[in-house]
Amino acid sequence: MTTQKFGQIIDGVALSAKLRADVATRVLALKARGVTPGLAVILVGEDPASAVYVRNKVKACQDTGVRSVFEKYEATLSEADLLARIAALNADPSIHGILVQMPIPKHINPHKVIEAISVTKDVDGYATLSAGELMTGAPGFRPCTPYGCMKLIETTGIDLRGKHAVVIGRSNTVGKPMALLLLQANATVTVCHSATRDIGYHTRQADVIVAAVGKRNVLTADMVKPGAVVIDVGMNRNDEGKLCGDVDFAGVKEVAGFITPVPGGVGPMTITMLLVNTLEAAERTVK
């Protein structure tokens, strides 16, 4: 009989590096066939956090051989001009993925912008058609953060079939697609949110917990079944200004079988899965 180990760290940095190496190899194979995967990244305005995210995405492209086209516009850019630029990128065969960094200035409708991106180039997986493909199990693009979470869960060796998974959060970008991906893996899924009466009641029964609400300490040790897999999507700051997640890491790691840290867990995986989606978009053009 094996004894249960607690607090095993799921290393997102190591897994990300492994997956990026695989992307680089597949990019070389595509280039040998005359196709270089191309990702267009559009930044509108001066949001400092967005600028950092975009820099990281462009660097990740450079590191793996993906061609990145970075377009930066003033915050005064009109909605019509942005939509026209997206239409031009949709028609450009050298561009396989299009990403508009959010948030965008208030005079531009984000829904219109996301919907303007061709479903074949929607590597963020946010558009309504992409969400429909995910819902029906069609082979579309999976949103990068939930896709990365699934890869992290895979590393634990847990067979999700019949397991109880609880997702805390119901956002269109993480919570809802996360629940769908877990369903596709044959888990029994419960989604908790701000109107859930007793989140702990549900999480204490869970074999897998994904916390994705953007609120510190939403999951504490008393809410976790011993040996559970805990994935922390949150990105917050503690009282000392240090990065922390939605999970009380120090407490929960004493109970959980596996847990992702913040930073170094889900974060690195999000950009990696963006590269994977862009690569797959390019591969589809030569199949």
Swiss-Prot record:
Instruction: Provide the E.C. number(s) assigned to this enzyme.
Output: 1.5.1.5, 3.5.4.9
Q: Which domain of life is it from?
A: Bacteria
The biological processes this protein is annotated with in GO are: L-histidine biosynthetic process; methionine biosynthetic process; purine nucleotide biosynthetic process; tetrahydrofolate interconversion
InterPro entries tied to this protein: Aminoacid_DH-like_N_sf, NAD(P)-bd_dom_sf, THF_DH/CycHdrlase, THF_DH/CycHdrlase_cat_dom, THF_DH/CycHdrlase_CS, THF_DH/CycHdrlase_NAD-bd_dom
One GO CC annotation: cytosol
Q: Which UniProt keywords apply?
A: Amino-acid biosynthesis, Histidine biosynthesis, Hydrolase, Methionine biosynthesis, Multifunctional enzyme, NADP, One-carbon metabolism, Oxidoreductase, Purine biosynthesis
For this chain, the family text in UniProt reads: Belongs to the tetrahydrofolate dehydrogenase/cyclohydrolase family.
Q: How does it assemble?
A: Homodimer.
Put simply, this protein is called: Bifunctional protein FolD
Q: Which organism is it from?
A: Albidiferax ferrireducens (strain ATCC BAA-621 / DSM 15236 / T118)
Q: What is the lineage of its organism?
A: Bacteria, Pseudomonadati, Pseudomonadota, Betaproteobacteria, Burkholderiales
State the encoding gene.
folD
